[in-house]
């Protein structure tokens, strides 16, 4: 029986872990084994890549656990957390986030509505055993969206001994009244490993150190220093099976993550003080709110034979996001929906992913890897409002990577990749807006420009990535790395075809269907000194982006009724250092 307790000024994390093994070990031998395996494994992983690598295993994740994976990693240099209220967060690497970094779990890139500033990461933080963070251009291996880096969640490794094991974890925070827990049970028998986990968290309204805020030039009161209706919860379940026998290994994972979070009504639409009065309940979730359910099924297949490693990753994801708000319309001709009248926005994203990798070790000096990826997406919409159109998206790419090891101290790596992508966007006509603009006296040219909230778009993209780097260990405890890489990113559908008021940010966001893909060059170097229990890391990087896509304020009000400033997707050269 092992008990772990970590406390802090803002929160408490308590973990109870029990492990019944068929083969018994002494405490001394177990501790020694963990130290030796962890140290050699981390050192080997750092030497395998020319990019800056951070590797975190279960002990680190437990010590810094917050109930939120991104917040757990926010103290890592170069990694930041964009917090969305008390419960959800989005990751950033070296200042890049959203669709400019990739999050991978069990070999499959996480695909949700990550373009939204108020959309969190749908991953159970309790269910993470090991995390690897690659900083820098990673499009070579991971394709588009990995310009800034990758957060890779690795699967649980078997201990190669028959055992029953389990974990019970409790989480509590004084700020926002967070309470949560997780229960995991598993069995390892011969070549099989099976694990089941259930997790749940609840948190109250968000506490702030002020009594008023300014919203749309109006002073809005904050009663009890709590942002009303910002409570939320998440409920997650997952099952994982792993099989390893001689030259073959595989795993299958099924997970479902459900999250629900309220929106502060004082910053939703036109300011209304009456909606902010204290209801004496800091945990209820009323309108407006958002909810998302993320279902994911993945499998990894791997075969080893005579210096050849063939692996495949296949996955299906269904991200169902809804935003609810009391039915309101600025058009007297728009009729309230008969079913679910308060469901404002619906996004249903289906994603099919597959990848194949072939690794060849022709000698002790040369190693080659070839790979192919494919992804198919289909997004459907619903609700009484419009923000993003329906679309279909297809991407595929192939790469080649070669590593030459001169000796045990020096290795050089280089590779190239080419991707093709196609996106088909469905048109969306808004007759209610047309009638409204006629009544307001707008010119016919303006009316026709806004008749179609989304125009039909069928575009194809192609681009390449490349990378070259060196890893040098001149002496024990010293590690030097340098890498130069070119990466790219296909424009997102929100950048091409969004056209509506997004209540999460309360601005009119309008896409541009003529945008081309982003390209970027990045050079980074690092030096690591490891001496006994001390480790010193010095790293630097410089980035240059061509056709960097961003939301540009137009300096004019939207023609949509009761809207706000208009922001349009635009592209420009930019440099980050």
What are these regions (language model features)?
Residues 176-202, 215-264, 293-295, 299-305, ...:
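Transmembrane beta-barrel wall of Gram-negative outer-membrane proteins
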